[in-house]
Design a protein with these regions (language model features):
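Active-site-proximal helix-loop-helix substrate-binding element of RNase H-like nuclease domains
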Residues: 50-73, 132-176
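Catalytic phosphate/metal-binding cores of nucleic-acid and nucleotide-processing enzymes, i.e., regions
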Residues: 2-4, 14-24, 38-40, 98, ...
């Protein structure tokens, strides 16, 4: 029998392309579980944190994407260790006795940031060294080319996936919830 899992749809916003030189500025997460009908479904719970900058790097282009300013993060962000302790505790509480599986839309970017920040904070990564990428999953499930796996195209192909709210895109918790819905649409499709 397969091990019970809880998927965690996670989205990261950052001040640049790599952690350590640049900052993870916000993180959103939404758990996904099997419902009583055996379908994958996002839970109503969510996690969101804005993180105080720990590194000097800030690319103008990256900062324009999510609209969080260095000044806002300096004043309102949570310290790195505290943010990662909060995420760890929340993840363990949501996963309970299941295995926590990291999911991202372009998971390598998001996982890289989260894994780095757990290590930087001196904490064990509750998601381990594995991640599920919804772009790759969409390629397989829908027989798509990589370039056709963006969220806009997937919203056209998956009738139950809502259109993106352009006012909320690049808010980490909005993106995490949207990705959770996308994950469920892909996982619940017939084989």
């Amino acid at each position: 029998m397969a091990e019970s899992i809880t998927y965690f749809s996670i989205d990261v916003e950052a001040s640049g392309p790599v952690p350590g030189l640049f900052n993870m500025v916000s993180l959103g997460a939404v758990p996904v579980h099997h419902d009583e009908d055996g379908q994958w479904k996002p839970r109503s719970e969510e996690f969101y944190v804005e993180i105080k900058p720990a590194f000097e790097g800030f690319e103008t282009e990256a900062m324009e994407i999510h609209k969080l300013t260095k000044e806002h993060l300096d004043a309102n962000g949570v310290d790195t260790k505290e943010a990662m302790e909060q995420l760890n505790a929340w993840t363990l509480d949501q996963a309970q006795k299941t295995r926590a599986v990291f999911v991202g839309h372009n998971a390598p970017f998001d996982w890289m940031n989260v894994a780095y920040y757990f290590a930087y904070a001196g904490l064990k990564n509750p998601y381990g060294y594995n991640a599920l990428d919804t772009k790759a999953l969409a390629m397989g499930k829908l027989d798509l080319h990589w370039l056709d796996t963006n969220k806009e195209r997937l919203a056209e192909l998956l009738p139950n996936l809502p259109a993106l709210d352009t006012e909320q895109v690049h808010n980490a918790v909005y993106d995490a919830r949207y990705q959770a819905i996308l994950l469920c649409e892909l996982l619940n499709r017939p084989k």
